[in-house]
Design a protein with these regions (language model features):
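Acidic/aromatic-lined carbohydrate-recognition and catalytic surfaces
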Residues: 1-30
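Active-site groove signature of glycoside hydrolases
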Residues: 17, 33-86
Length: 440
């Protein structure tokens, strides 16, 4: 908070007061008294509001700003767990609004003005869908939403300006202040999706400007392990800031990016290519890293003839020399080196096994050994990246994942070795056909 103030920035707390609270449900004190079902709080219970009061008290102590994001997104099953058992079925709009009023009262108690994600109002009116072309809301809902709460329209998955236009129009059914949130798309795995996110942000921000939306921010979520480096999405952050100022000249933005970071924008977005230019936000650099060499659920998704990691690795080499951000490029270059072997290892293993080509299998064992070495290098660089950017909390997940991956590679190597010397008659996993992952 002090650092933000020194840089003339306002640090606004963003909490959850309805769903996405599964972490705290690990403790029986909360799980048994505060939760409706899954990660959704039990609306109407005193213990729930004691918990929320504590959240606001902490935020009031830690933050200078008296604006707060109270969350409330994606509570798809609100009112359908313990609440249903206790009260029977109730109109879920009414449950949501009842809870919102209680949370608003607590916010006001601590001097906060609130903003919240808007999706649940639309989902409850449209069969669970948020992004509907003809989004209409019951008049009583529009009337009952407290007017002092800003509504945040969030949208990370479209590049179509007309889509944003329609959704902003739908939000303007409310008399509330509307805020827009786009995303940096840095939450899909180890590599960013800068080019996709910049394109999406440009369309969205053009729409916001034309539709008089003044407040815009970029979300930088870190789902499922926070593997993507924090600064790997700098092209999105800078581009969004320039778009918001009315500058849509990519050449001009690229010059500014080079001046601020010391890296050519074109070289920086080479980070995206670790996913081999996958469609939209697909993340093969993650799922093929962890795909099992023998079970291969994702093997049918591969274009085996177009691995491309050697080419990407060479592009990333340029960025490794940058003083400030070189560590990002070193980590992802190392991942490319591991994926050069790992990406299609399962496909190659199954193919030579089924041909009963013992000479080729023996040669393949070298790949398993080399892969383990490259994974150890990647682990060390990824750990260095984590310690530079993050608190220790959370890396235990990567110890388990990457440690488990290396153990599985060793195990598969041993199984193949035993087969080659006659200790196994066959390898049943490799005799099964891999089913298509996507509908063909």
């Amino acid at each position: 908070d002090r650092a933000a103030k020194e840089n003339e920035l306002e640090l606004i707390p963003c909490i959850q007061t309805l769903a996405h609270l599964g972490g705290i449900a690990r403790w029986p004190e909360y799980a048994n008294s505060c939760f409706d079902l899954n990660d959704i709080l039990f609306v109407g219970e005193d213990r729930t509001y004691k918990l929320i009061d504590g959240m606001f008290a902490t935020c009031a102590e830690c933050f200078t700003s008296r604006r707060i994001n109270i969350g409330m997104d994606e509570a798809h099953l609100v009112g359908l767990g313990k609440y249903l058992d206790k009260h029977g079925y109730e109109n879920r709009f009414e449950i949501l609004l009842k809870h919102l009023r209680r949370v608003s009262e607590i916010a006001e108690k601590y001097g906060f003005s609130s903003m919240m994600w808007s999706d649940m109002f639309f989902r409850l009116a449209n069969g669970g869908e948020y992004y509907c072309v003809n989004n209409t809301l019951p008049q009583e809902v529009k009337d009952l939403v407290p007017k002092n709460i800003s509504l945040i329209y969030w949208d990370y998955y479209s590049t179509d300006k007309s889509h944003f236009d329609a959704m902003i129009k739908a939000h303007k059914q409310f008399d509330n202040n509307i805020i827009f949130a786009c995303g940096d798309s840095g939450w899909y795995g180890f590599a960013p999706h800068n080019q996709y996110a910049v394109f999406a942000c440009e369309s969205a921000i053009r729409s916001c400007i034309e539709n008089d939306i003044e407040d815009i921010f970029v979300t930088c979520w870190k789902d499922d392990g926070a593997e993507c480096p924090l600064f790997a999405t700098l092209p999105v952050i800078l581009s969004a800031a320039e778009f918001a100022r009315g500058n849509f000249n990519i050449e001009n933005i690229a010059k500014k990016f080079r001046r601020l970071t010391g890296i050519c924008l074109e070289n920086f977005v080479a980070l995206d290519e670790v996913n081999l230019n996958a469609e939209k936000t697909n993340n093969p650099c993650k799922y093929m890293l962890y795909s099992d060499p023998f079970l291969g659920i994702f093997d049918k998704t591969l274009n085996v003839e177009n691995g491309g990691f050697a080419t990407v690795k060479e592009k990333l080499q340029i960025g490794t020399k940058n003083r400030k951000y070189g560590y990002i490029f070193r980590t992802l270059k190392s991942l490319c080196e591991a994926l050069e072997i790992k990406y299609d290892l399962g496909v190659r293993t199954r193919a030579v096994y089924r041909k009963k080509d013992c000479a080729a299998l023996k040669e393949l064992l070298r790949d398993y050994k080399e892969l383990e070495k490259r994974l150890k290098v990647f682990y060390r660089l990824f750990l260095t990246q984590w310690e530079k950017e993050c608190k220790p909390n959370g890396f235990e997940k990567h110890d388990i994942r990457l440690g488990g991956l290396m153990q599985r590679i060793r195990h598969c190597h041993n199984i193949l070795s035993e087969y080659l010397v006659g200790k196994r008659e066959g390898i049943s996993e490799l005799e099964e056909d891999i089913l298509p992952f996507n509908k063909e």
